[in-house]
From Swiss-Prot:
Belongs to the PA-phosphatase related phosphoesterase family. Signal peptide: none annotated. It comes from the Eukaryota. Residues 688-702 have a biased composition (Basic residues). It comes from Rattus norvegicus (Rat). It is a multi-pass membrane protein. This is Phospholipid phosphatase-related protein type 4. Glycans are attached at N269, N363, N433, N456, N515, N545. The chain crosses the membrane at residues 68-88, 120-140, 179-199, 248-268, 277-297, 309-329. SUPFAM superfamilies: Acid phosphatase/Vanadium-dependent haloperoxidase (SSF48317). It is found in: Postsynaptic density membrane.
Amino acid sequence: MQRAGSSGARGECDISGTGRLRLEQAARLGGRAVHTSPTGGLGARQVAGMSAKERPKGKVIKDSVTLLPCFYFVELPILASSVVSLYFLELTDVFKPVHSGFSCYDRSLSMPYIEPTQEAIPFLMLLSLAFAGPAITIMVGEGILYCCLSKRRNGAGLEPNINAGGCNFNSFLRRAVRFVGVHVVGLCSTALITDIIQLATGYQAPYFLTVCKPMYTSLEGSCKENSYIVEEICSGSDLTVINNGKKSFPSQHATLAAFAAVYVSMYFNSTLTDSSKLLKPLLVFTFIICGIICGLTRITQYKNHPVDVYCGFLIGGGIALYLGLYAVGNFLPSEDSMLQHRDALRSLTDLNQDPSRVLSAKNGSSGDGIAHTEGILNRNHRDASSLTNLKRANADVEIITPRSPMGKESMVTFSNTLPRANTPSVEDPVRRNASIHASMDSARSKQLLTQWKSKNESRKMSLQVMDSEPEGQSPPRSIEMRSSSEPSRVGVNGDHHVPGNQYLKIQPGTVPGCNNSMPAGPRVSIQSRPGSSQLVHIPEETQENISTSPKSSSARAKWLKAAEKTVACNRGNNQPRIMQVIAMSKQQGVLQSSPKNAEGSTVTCTGSIRYKTLTDHEPSGIVRVEAHPENNRPIIQIPSSTEGEGSGSWKWKAPEKSSLRQTYELNDLNRDSESCESLKDSFGSGDRKRKHIDSNEHHHHGITTIRVTPVEGSEIGSETLSVSSSRDSTLRRKGNIILIPERSNSPENTRNIFYKGTSPTRPYKD
């Protein structure tokens, strides 16, 4: 079959039935339903090529049943009735304005009358300009827009064609008719509204008395007696001019000019792009200024009062604004308006499923970041899962994972200030530290530390050393207490990011010689800043979930018993609580009793290295202690100073041969060191009850963590150090109390870490 086409196929509507719709349908069907044109035909290849050329333009055709009926039976009758009504109101005297009174010899109504032919903008010129000017501008703009959009690939941006009654209406025809039609109807409506208001008010124009020529002699009384005249006393010959003189409010010129200017300005703002920065403002200002001039000429030529013109501007602009927004949809394509409405009403689930709104992560940087994050989660599954157990809104806890595998069973007990970690550990050996930050009230922390410091100073803690061995002392070391304005952050690889801040240096005492010299001293890092939260490090010595097996229960009971036994060291020494914890955790010898105090309770701690207590500085923030007992078991004991060294400095005493080097760093927990084996004391049950009550209290304070890291070890001579002090001099720290008893290295060992903090308002007990 021969394919055919004609000029009728390219027209908007073809009476012979060879319209574009059928041609495009035939092209979509592969050229099967093709008709013959009466004017001749084209070859099959030519028609196939033409249809393929038109197909990429993608002109979607929609069938409409209500388009033509609405246009013929609704819109055209409204427009026709408006025009007819406007004709009778403007050009005939069928409808006359109401009669309103005036004052005798009113100078505001006695202005000269200017003939219509001498007006700057006559009424017919106004109608032609108000109708033709915007209409022509809109049609030209729509033609240019249609040509530009039709050249795009697949006709993007064009409205779909409408097939109604066998006629195909493209976007240019539809938009031009819609915009121009609304403009014409709007002008007619504005003129009708203005005429109705003028007829209803009957307000006189400034030239009314000039054309009326009132006969004051026909009045029953003089103008002095009747200053306000309501009778009809005009003697002018031209009734049309007299009636027009009674229709001043609002100004017809002002309303029509304002409507045309605002309507076409809205069209320019919505249609023109921003490629030309000055074209749109130029066109908008041109039409606005023209409308303003049309209204002001009515004032200068005494046709209307100023208030009439101003009210006319408001009425015309309001009508144009309403029609532009609601009748033509702000001159936007109908499909775009529908899409915008659907986007606004689309649910969040639809937006999440929309592939156009999903960010692609296929580039290198984002892919690396995602892979890195997934690797972190896989390597430290325990830390990620433990975050789900944080119930506090501002909880941001830093968890330091151990660097070496710990015992078979572990048990971590926290106070009510921090959540429990009840998740198993799936940790890669490469994984070092995971950081989570816990915010605290810095003001409250400073208050507690100040109270602790004042209490500590009031007791005038004195350090007494029972063993006097002056030989083999090593050079003094310094303890640096750092007060930071920003909390320290521990990265994934264990690196610390700490900004520079101020230092508080404390000169310690000397270290007696032992098998190894100890040139390096402890480093206490305390970070705080007024008005900022403190960083709390919570070490986790566990790699397994906290089990409720009988073995764990028995282990916990044993460590609770060991904790009660440590009252001897705590009551026998006038030392800070933190140093008592270190001494208890590092002890390995059996305590020997000797009558030292009035109560008969004695404490003897056996070890290879002797230490003096820490200074009075409040241990707020972060505390780290690192010791490295690779082969031997050093014991940390804090004796009291008897040689006038109660200044609160560190002194390290060890056996004569100086070969051991140990470093104590704050903020890491004891990794490989051995634990205290046994403690002997003679304290009564009353003290144990008090200790038990203290251990059951819940406190709201930060937690100080200690990590003892071995560096190098050698032979350490074991010596005995006896420490005693008054029972009333026991210091109850206002800060954080940490009890860390450690068991031996046996496979069945169990470590219990008890974190205790005193209540913020709890007083110190003697």
